[in-house]
Every structure is written in C-alpha cells, then in structure tokens.
Amino acid sequence: MAAAAAAPSPSFSKTLSSSSSKSSTLLPRSTFPFPHHPHKTTPPPLHLTPTHIHSQRRRFTISNVISTTQKVSETQKAETFVSRFAPDEPRKGSDVLVEALEREGVTDVFAYPGGASMEIHQALTRSSIIRNVLPRHEQGGVFAAEGYARATGFPGVCIATSGPGATNLVSGLADALLDSVPIVAITGQVPRRMIGTDAFQETPIVEVTRSITKHNYLVMDVEDIPRVVREAFFLARSGRPGPVLIDVPKDIQQQLVIPDWDQPMRLPGYMSRLPKLPNEMLLEQIVRLISESKKPVLYVGGGCSQSSEELRRFVELTGIPVASTLMGLGAFPTGDELSLSMLGMHGTVYANYAVDSSDLLLAFGVRFDDRVTGKLEAFASRAKIVHIDIDSAEIGKNKQPHVSICADIKLALQGLNSILESKEGKLKLDFSAWRQELTVQKVKYPLNFKTFGDAIPPQYAIQVLDELTNGSAIISTGVGQHQMWAAQYYKYRKPRQWLTSGGLGAMGFGLPAAIGAAVGRPDEVVVDIDGDGSFIMNVQELATIKVENLPVKIMLLNNQHLGMVVQWEDRFYKANRAHTYLGNPSNEAEIFPNMLKFAEACGVPAARVTHRDDLRAAIQKMLDTPGPYLLDVIVPHQEHVLPMIPSGGAFKDVITEGDGRSSY
C-alpha cells in the first residue's frame, strides 16, 4: 500500500479546468525540443519522437477528470503510451517509477544521486525520453524544478536521496507551496525494514514536509507506484497548484513487479471539495457593481497566470486600470496604458493611490498578503471588494469581501466577459475621469532614480537590459533589492516571464530557477538578475550551466552588501551595520569575493563593468555571447528601493525620497 501522509488539505481544493493532470494528458509545450542524451550508450529499444510525446499533452477540463475511479480504456492506452517493456515483463520498481514519469509526459528532471536513490538513477539511464540535468546541490535541483514549472506551466520534477539529500529540498518545497508552483519531488528512503531504526541517512521526510507540501506519500507497496505518480501529478497541478512529495524506500525500488497502469486514482475527498463552475448570478452581480462604480481597480495576482488573454479582454471591455502583485507581473502587460504596474510595499505610488482611492476593488487570484496590504484596516478602506480565487481558504482569510466566488479565474473571467459582451451597447462604462486622475499621479510620481558621477545605478542596469531584450526575456531573480528593481523596471509582457521567490523570499533562487527555465524553454533568452548575497548561496550551479551548456545569462548587481537589510538599517536602525557587509573588512577597496574567479573556475565567460558609460556595451556583449555568461555589475550600496511603505504601514506612510547617503 502507499501510506498517504495526509489527505490533501481542504485549503488546497481547487477547480480542475485550467491545470489538472492525468496520466499522459498534460499541458502542451509546443516549443520545447526533445532533450538530447549525449552520454547514453545503451538506449532502450523504444524511441518516441518529440511530436509523439508532446502531442499527448492536453489541457484538462472538468469533463475529462470527473470520473477518476474509472479504468482507462484500451483506446486511451493505445493512444497515450507505448512501453519499452512487454506487458507481462517484470521490472524493478525504479523502472516502473521512471516509466510512470514518462507516461505523465516528463522529459526533464533535476536529480542528484545518493545511496537511497541509486536505483532511480540507474533506471533513468535506461530511459530514452527523460533527460537528467544534474544540479550541484539538491536545493539547486528543487529551485530548478520550480523555475521549469514557473516558465512552462508543466510540473517540474526533482529527485534526491534520503536524509540530507531530502532535507535539502525543504526550502524549495516551502517556496513552491507559498507561490502555488506545481512540482513533484521524489526522494529515496531507507529500506522499509529500517524505517524507524535511525538508519544511516534516515530522515522522516514525509513528516518533515507535511506542512509545506500540498500532499505527500510514503510508498509501502511497489504495486502502488503507477497510481501514486498519477495522483501526484494530478494534485500538483489541479486546483491551486503546489508541491507533492513521493518518498520511495530503496527495497521498493529494487522489487520486481508487473505494473498495473489502469489503477484508478483514489482521491474522493479531494475531488468532492473542488469548486464548481462560477455562479452566473454572482457574475451578474459583479457586472452590476462595476456599472455602479466610479473608481474601480483590478488587483491581480499569480492566480491569473493561466488567464492572461481573458484578463486582457476583460480590461478591454471595461476600461478598468490594473495593479499587479509581485507574483502577478506579466498577467497583464506592464507597458499597457491601463497598467498601474506593481502595488504593495515597493509598488508604484499611483498603483497604491488607485487602491486607496477606489470604490470597487476587483481582487482576482490574490491572497491579500501583508506585503501588498500593509495595515489591513486601511487597505482599500473605501472600496467594495470582489474576491475571486481558486482556493476557498483564501477568501475572507485576511480581508472580508462583499462578493466572493471560489472558482478558476479563467472560467470566471470567461463568464464575466460573456456577460459584458452580451450587454455591449447597453452598459455605459465610462471611467475616463478616473483614469485621468490616475494619469496625474503617474506624471507626479513616476518611478525614478538619481545618478552619482559615473557610478552605475542598479535601476538603470535593468532599464538597459529591458531595452536590449525588448522586454521579452525570461527573468529570474534572487531575493532583495535587485528583485524589487527587476519587478519595477523590467516591463513584462506576458505570463511565465517573471520567476521569483515571492511568498518565502528564498535567497539563492535566481540561478537555479534560470536553469530550469532554460531547460524548459530553450529557445528563449533567460537572464538571472541577481544580487551578490543571493547569488553566492547557490554559486555552485555555475558548474551546471557550463556542463549542460545552458545559455543562462547572469547580470549580477554587486554592491558588496545585503542591500535590502542595509536599507532597513539605514531607515530604522540609524545605519548601524549588523553583519550586512559581504566584502573583506581588511581590504574594503577590493571587490570580494571575486565573482569572476568563480565563473573562471567553471569555465563560464565573465566580465566586470564599473562605469555607467560602459554598461550598455557590456550587457549587449553578455546577450550576444553564445552559452552561459556572467556580468558583474558594480553598483553603489547606498541605493534604496523606492517607493516604500514601511511594514504594517498604510498608503499615507509611503516613502518616496532618500537613500543611504542621508541620515534618518
């Protein structure tokens, strides 16, 4: 049997229409070429073409997941997958596990081997379908799986051994849960007979990760592997996406079995709690509220990442301005005239002004987190609130809405658009005066920065990158000031272009996430905008981008400090430095550590730029150089991310001036 660690939490019961998963029927990834395996010496007899693999991926709807306890038909089986094993041929549990991944459409994994997962790695070498991108640390592997999932919409897969290998996944799993990222993590475990004996490298990873996964499994019967893998992918991407962990004891991996691929999923409780289609009467009520309002604002978050087209159509029909959360960037084009860019602690003045002045707040795919709302009682205090979210636990958790719908945002927007289109000509929606009021705020309080001599303002570096890439690159970041500047100054055009650790704020995320994006979307320009503090936390992944020849570009904004903490020290602790200087105290004139030497050690081309006049050419060279590249951009540590609403503050407390050169 497979011992499920916990039933999927009701708080993660979601609708299935936009991101569900069932065996071999997954979201299309039309631009991803089949991975090359240069080191395979004895490929198995089956060779599937990329077209065959990707043609099996399709988007789920309610109708094709509603009957999860029925057997898969013979027609479905014939269409979805052809095994390299004969139907009655026994094979190891590890081979069953790898084939189960293949049947789910997996073509890339991020796996680091160890004693308890060796069997899985041996099975991976027998696969002609799955490429393993070897990270240099398990945290790099789980963050890469996240980057892959965030960039493609397809669940990322990471694999680690037991004990320290498994515990090294913890930050990535917590990050994926908070940011609703679909990943499947597989861990090796000590043999069943040794569980609970404090065996070498034994860690109860199911217990450790119970509160930071959407669901997890300890597989105690080899025959359960096909069902468990199928359920894991289904859970990871249905409803509100999230991480699922599968813990597989080593003796289960070694056991011979003839798998039953027709096992039904066993998720009756989860299925019964999924949201229904949006209530049409409630949608009509929302349209009525819009027609009655004078100052409506859209507040959109990561929950809108799958419904960008519907969102754009809704804005086109209503003329309502759009403010995005950090996780919502790209769902609506930042450069659009109706975009207010990002709201919240480091959001634009005009976005926060709009929310503060609004009489109707349309909150779509958001959770009213503290970095957006600040002081809850003061947030949108004049507005009626409409909250639509796929997670029922988020509705009313932080802010009580006037109207709420627990539904897939895509379906809700389709319903709203249909109603609006049917009333076109009858509804007289005119918010031009409101938009003009916001334009005044845009002109009065634009995003801006100062220059000092020939030093490179970090904001300017991102502006230049945006210009040279035409706003079309996939951007990953670490966490800190550089992250906020990347959110403010790069103009995101579409979803899955912006990869950042939002809820957890995990430093070290940027480079591994860029690796995942480069693997999943190899035809795109991928740039990791990083800080020296974040970058060095997973600097070992330079070896990965070199060995895998991944064209990841790293633009390092190097200020020799933990910049965001320094900013808070400047503002609230009288600039008292408490272990935030990352350079060499005995020689502050040198750049320490020398990031170029890290790159050189891994064979990655690198350069340093210190003068503003040299920056554009340096960034262009980075973009033009084939393969990976590191550009070390030296920036002043006195810069502050502005605007800033202090933690727990309200819009009236916004800070728009000053930096570390001043006293407070």
Swiss-Prot record:
Note: There are two distinct ALS genes in tobacco. The enzyme shown here is derived from the ALS gene on locus SuRB. Acetolactate synthase is the target enzyme for sulfonylurea and imidazolinone herbicides.
Protein family membership: Belongs to the TPP enzyme family.
Cofactor binding annotation: Binds 1 Mg(2+) ion per subunit. Binds 1 thiamine pyrophosphate per subunit.
Region (Disordered) residue spans: 1-51
E.C. numbers: 2.2.1.6
Top-level enzyme category: transferase
Pfam families: TPP_enzyme_C (PF02775), TPP_enzyme_M (PF00205), TPP_enzyme_N (PF02776)
Native source organism of the sequence: Nicotiana tabacum
Pathway note: Amino-acid biosynthesis; L-isoleucine biosynthesis; L-isoleucine from 2-oxobutanoate: step 1/4; Amino-acid biosynthesis; L-valine biosynthesis; L-valine from pyruvate: step 1/4
Taxonomy, superkingdom: Eukaryota
Swiss-Prot/TrEMBL keywords: Amino-acid biosynthesis, Branched-chain amino acid biosynthesis, Chloroplast, Disulfide bond, FAD, Flavoprotein, Herbicide resistance, Magnesium, Metal-binding, Plastid, Thiamine pyrophosphate, Transferase, Transit peptide
Signal sequence, start to end: none
Binding site for Mg(2+): D532, N559
NCBIfam families: acolac_lg
Disulfide bonding pattern of the chain: C158-C304
Targeting signal (transit peptide) range: 1-91
InterPro entries xrefs: Acetolactate_synth_lsu, AHAS_TPP, DHS-like_NAD/FAD-binding_dom, THDP-binding, Thiamin_PyroP_enz_cen_dom, Thiamin_PyroP_enz_TPP-bd_dom, TPP-bd_CS, TPP_enz
Binding site for thiamine diphosphate: E138
Annotated FAD binding sites: 240, 346-367, 389-408
Gene that produces this protein: ALS SURB
Protein name per Swiss-Prot or TrEMBL: Acetolactate synthase 2, chloroplastic
One of the record's GO cellular component terms: chloroplast
Cofactor list: Mg(2+); thiamine diphosphate
Effect of substituting W568L: In S4-Hra; highly resistant to sulfonylurea herbicides
GO biological process: isoleucine biosynthetic process; L-valine biosynthetic process; response to herbicide
Chief location bin: plastid
Bias (Low complexity) ranges: 1-34
